A protein has these predicted regions:
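Acyl activation and transfer enzymes in specialized metabolism, enriched
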Residues: 1-34, 183-185, 192-195
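Acyl-thioester-dependent acyl-group transfer interface
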Residues: 30-220
Length: 220
């Protein structure tokens, strides 16, 4: 889809590119939840590039994660209301002090002398179980890799980029190349109603959406 169209809609809704798309994802999840499921908060896991806060030359992944949480207080999911709450979550969490606090928390655990003396035979299962418990709270994940720049000599031979990652639950990764914006969706569920709602909402707003799927019976 054209990134310029999505960016225009985001600005019209007084949101950033990522905030706008996360709001769309939250509404799409809400639309496909039962009345009982809607009592629980929707939590979107969002990786944050730490280089914008702490300059680093490392080529390794340098990120932390924030959680965007939404609990509906109405019978219907109001898109404008969701955007406001997503913006508040970003504004409150995307600060250097908060990010530093997240890093410090993990650093304290890693350097705890009690934790360090625990044998790996015990430590690894405990860490995996802790990760499992933390992951269970998340509803979905959304990662925006941003704009991909390629040398002009090679760019003319590339049509677009897509990103896919292994995921236990619906997860979206997106990136932009030129004016082409691609969203890679992955998950273990065959039911794609959440994705249908997500892209249909964009299409209803006037975005020219093209779907490419490896599911032969997937229809939009």
């Amino acid at each position: 889809m054209p990134s310029s169209e999505v960016l225009r809609l985001a600005h019209e809704n007084n949101a950033t590119f990522t905030e706008f798309l996360i709001a769309d994802l939250i509404c799409s999840i809400y639309d496909n939840m039962t009345a009982r499921e809607r009592r629980r908060p929707i939590i979107i896991n969002v990786p944050v590039n730490l280089r914008q806060f702490f300059p680093s030359e490392t080529t390794r992944n340098f990120f932390c994660v924030i959680n965007v949480e939404y609990t509906a207080d109405k019978s219907e999911c109001d898109f404008a209301d969701v955007i406001k709450k997503v913006k508040l979550a970003f504004e409150s969490q995307l600060t250097k002090d908060n990010i530093q606090g997240i890093i410090n928390k993990f650093s304290v655990i890693e350097n705890n002398p009690v934790v360090r003396v625990i044998p790996l035979l015990l430590k690894i299962p405990i860490m995996r179980f802790s990760s499992y418990l933390a992951d269970c709270k998340n509803t979905s994940s959304f990662s925006n890799l941003g704009r991909i720049d390629i040398h002009e000599n090679a760019a003319e031979y590339i049509n677009m980029f897509d990103v896919f990652v292994k995921a236990k639950r619906p997860q979206m990764c997106c990136c932009t190349f030129g004016d082409k914006f691609g969203i890679g969706e992955d998950g273990q569920l065959v039911n794609k109603e959440i994705e249908r709602s997500f892209f249909c909402r964009l299409a209803d707003m006037g975005v020219d959406v093209q779907i490419i799927s490896n599911l032969s019976q997937f229809e939009m």
